[in-house]
């Protein structure tokens, strides 16, 4: 059975922008061949974020990225391309695992630098039991070297180090970004940062991003010691209310001059140290007008409304990731990654 699943069975039609994948396959793809992911993101103008997880799978969410208008059928084509890329990664992972097992068997059976010399023949005669090296006055042998990477993976890793992820040619006048340490041709990354001040590989933001969230909104925060979230029962709960009155779209919005209705959204965080850290980052994102935008609702299909802007909030106390609630063991870590991609950090 393939590790790559098209979607979770419980998602239904609302998950057409989601892909479910086994953790080993995603980790292999994102760590061994990040240039492929970067090229997919750039060609299809999408972001790919981890939206939920279980013990053995990730739920990936694809979202349009870049200036409007989005390409027709953009998410469908991006999702199809991602599924194909994941299937290729799955095959390569299985092949690498088989090669690793074979090399491990040879290493165990050989016992030296030339295992082919020990494949046949009787075992060597021993005159007496061997003593530990220290007991014979000899220094202990050095620890064994780890098995080398399979040749294909080693060549691909070396190629990635010298290949620009933007132009896919050999890096010319290498420029390494300070925070994430990804390297590019100087000319390629200069042009890319003029379009969007973020690393094309990982999305790490460079500079301060200001969004188009309506300016007349308020972020209200209160704490409820009696409201307990699953997995955080020894803490109280931070309750966040976002309140927006009706208004008129400005020049930075999809339909300037068109009215949009008001809305109120409620979100929950555990009142623990990590939850309060996320609250501070949420305040920064709200002040930089990044938490919401104006567009078409993904749930109702209604246009010209205030919608979330790819910073996931827990709008339910319970129900797990499928119902936007708790428990969700890695949510606080994931949402900090989403915020970091928009340049919102605690430094």
Swiss-Prot record:
Entry-linked InterPro entries: Deltex_C (IPR039396), Deltex_C_sf (IPR039399), Deltex_fam (IPR039398), Znf_RING (IPR001841), Znf_RING/FYVE/PHD (IPR013083), Znf_RING_CS (IPR017907)
Biological process terms in GO annotation: Notch signaling pathway; protein ubiquitination
Gene Ontology annotations for the cellular component aspect, listed alphabetically: cytoplasm; nucleoplasm
A family per Pfam: DTC
Name of the encoding gene: DTX3
Region (Disordered): 113-157
ZnF (RING-type) ranges: 164-205
Keyword presence, Cell cycle: no
Organism: Homo sapiens
Main EC class the enzyme belongs to: transferase
Entry's family note: Belongs to the Deltex family.
Keywords of this entry: Cytoplasm, Metal-binding, Notch signaling pathway, Transferase, Ubl conjugation pathway, Zinc, Zinc-finger
Protein's recorded name: Probable E3 ubiquitin-protein ligase DTX3
Compartments it resides in: Cytoplasm
Function in brief: Regulator of Notch signaling, a signaling pathway involved in cell-cell communications that regulates a broad spectrum of cell-fate determinations. Probably acts both as a positive and negative regulator of Notch, depending on the developmental and cell context. Functions as an ubiquitin ligase protein in vitro, suggesting that it may regulate the Notch pathway via some ubiquitin ligase activity.
């Amino acid at each position: 059975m393939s590790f790559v699943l098209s979607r979770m069975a419980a998602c239904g039609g609302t998950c057409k922008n989601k892909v479910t994948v086994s953790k080993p396959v995603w980790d292999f793809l994102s760590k061994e061949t990040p240039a492929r992911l970067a090229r997919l993101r750039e060609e299809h103008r999408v972001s790919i974020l981890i939206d939920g997880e279980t013990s053995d799978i990730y739920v990936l969410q694809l979202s349009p990225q870049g200036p409007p208008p989005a390409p027709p059928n953009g998410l469908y084509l991006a999702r199809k391309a991602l599924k194909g890329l994941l299937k290729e990664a799955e095959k390569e992972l299985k092949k690498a695992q088989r090669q690793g097992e074979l090399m491990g068997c040879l290493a165990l059976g050989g016992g030296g630098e030339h295992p082919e010399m020990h494949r046949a023949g009787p075992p060597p005669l021993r005159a007496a039991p061997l003593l530990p090296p220290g007991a014979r006055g000899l220094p202990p042998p050095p620890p064994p070297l780890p098995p080398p990477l399979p040749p294909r993976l080693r060549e691909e890793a070396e190629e990635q180090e010298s290949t620009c992820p933007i132009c896919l040619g050999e890096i010319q006048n290498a420029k390494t970004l300070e925070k994430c340490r990804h390297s590019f041709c100087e000319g390629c990354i200069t042009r890319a940062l003029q379009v969007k001040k973020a690393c094309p590989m990982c999305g790490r933001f460079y500079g301060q991003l200001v969004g188009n969230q309506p300016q007349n909104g308020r972020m209200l925060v209160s704490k409820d010691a009696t409201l307990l979230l699953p997995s955080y029962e020894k803490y109280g709960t931070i309750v966040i209310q976002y309140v927006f009155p009706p208004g008129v779209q400005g020049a930075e919005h999809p339909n300037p001059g068109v009215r949009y209705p008001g809305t109120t959204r409620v979100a929950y965080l555990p009142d623990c140290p990590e939850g309060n850290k996320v609250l501070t980052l949420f305040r920064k994102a709200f002040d930089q007008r990044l938490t919401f935008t104006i567009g078409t609702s993904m749930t109702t299909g209604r246009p010209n409304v205030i919608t979330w802007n790819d910073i996931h909030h827990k709008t339910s106390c319970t129900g797990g990731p499928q119902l936007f609630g708790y428990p969700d063991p890695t949510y606080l870590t994931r949402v900090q990654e989403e915020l970091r991609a928009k340049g919102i950090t605690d430094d």
